[in-house]
Amino acid sequence: MIIQQWSLLKKTKSFEFSFEIGGFYSRDNYKIFNQDRFIIIQNMGAPGLITDANKIEISDLEWDKFWNRIDLLGVWNWEKDYIDKGILDGIQWELMIDKKGRKRRRIYGSNKYPKNFEALTNLINEISKMNGEIMGYSED
């Protein structure tokens, strides 16, 4: 029993995931992150003001599928920043993924997105059970 608990604790502490997207005073500002095996979803009406929050337990199998798809999307090879300097306001986003002891990336964007960003937002919608609430922006 103790070995099973240690194995579970070790697995849940082996990664971090965080994704934020939204615009200044937009009603669709989201922060989605893991807390051990759980996904925490915060909807912020204004910067720093949480208007709604949910906590969903994610199975080990779902987490394994999530990380496999992160690998398939090539997110580890994305640029550090995607910024459209011609637009001063709009949509900003940030992704932080950390496979403890293996890989870590923090990627930021402002009105610009990697080519397969929409596939990432679909994946995040899927694991967070948000039914498409995060819009799938894409680079044209």
Name each model feature, range by range:
Residues 38-53:
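Acidic/histidine-rich, surface-exposed loop or edge segments in extracytoplasmic proteins
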Residues 66:
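Aromatic/basic micro-patches that form nucleic-acid/chromatin recognition or nuclease catalytic surfaces
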Residues 28-33, 53-56, 93:
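Hydrophobic/aromatic beta-strand elements that line small-molecule binding cavities or substrate pockets
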Residues 1-22, 56-57, 61, 69-70, ...:
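Short, well-ordered, aromatic-rich surface patches in folded extracellular/luminal domains
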Residues 40-42, 72-75:
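Generic short beta-strand segments
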Residues 31-39, 100-101:
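Short, solvent-exposed coil/turn segments at beta-strand boundaries
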